[in-house]
Design a protein with these regions (language model features):
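Residue-identity detector for threonine
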Residues: 21, 60-62, 111, 142
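Cytosolic/matrix-facing juxtamembrane and C-terminal tails of multi-pass cellular membrane proteins
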Residues: 74-148
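Regular secondary-structure segments
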Residues: 19-22, 26, 42, 90-93
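Alpha-helical transmembrane segments and their immediate juxtamembrane boundary regions
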Residues: 26-84
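Short, Lys/Arg-enriched charge-dense amphipathic segments
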Residues: 18, 48-64, 115-132
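Membrane-proximal, non-transmembrane interface segments of integral membrane proteins
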Residues: 1-28
């Protein structure tokens, strides 16, 4: 982002961060949902078969521990809030435009919402997913940036 220091530059930097974070979280939530689904399927099979009570107990403790379920719920919340924030940035940059009287106020508000969301959720984005998809997402971001300027 080659903008001179301004609220627009702050908004663009935050939008870029939210854009990439949303892309990573979308993939993270999918893989985490698959892991939980596998646990649940194994759990149901073991409950029906009642073969190995010790394994069933370990899976029960893992699957239903507050940490695993809470993390998944928090990840879902994070995803939905990121979707909302990215739509708000799109609204300002593509629909309302930066010439709108309230554009700076709206950009600051969305930027604060994004920073507060990151602070509240405390979810680290997967660098593995990011680096694997960075080229494709960077091209997509560059195309978006061209439409904004």
């Amino acid at each position: 982002n080659n903008e001179k220091p301004s609220i627009k530059k702050l908004g663009l930097n935050c939008y870029e961060s939210a854009f990439f974070t949303k892309k990573v979280v979308d993939k993270m939530i999918f893989s985490y949902a698959i892991k939980i689904s596998v646990f649940i399927i194994i759990y149901i099979i073991l409950m029906i078969k009642s073969i190995n009570i010790e394994l069933l107990l370990v899976i029960t403790q893992t699957l239903f521990s507050a940490e695993v379920l809470f993390y998944f719920i928090k990840l879902c919340y994070y995803k939905f809030q990121l979707d909302k924030i990215c739509k708000e940035f799109q609204d300002i940059f593509f629909i309302r435009g930066l010439s709108n009287d309230n554009a700076n106020v709206l950009l600051l508000n969305i930027t604060m919402d994004y920073e507060c969301l990151k602070s509240f959720c405390k979810i680290a984005s997967s660098s593995k997913i990011f680096f694997k998809n960075n080229k494709e997402w960077s091209e997509e971001w560059t195309n978006l940036l061209k439409k904004i300027k």
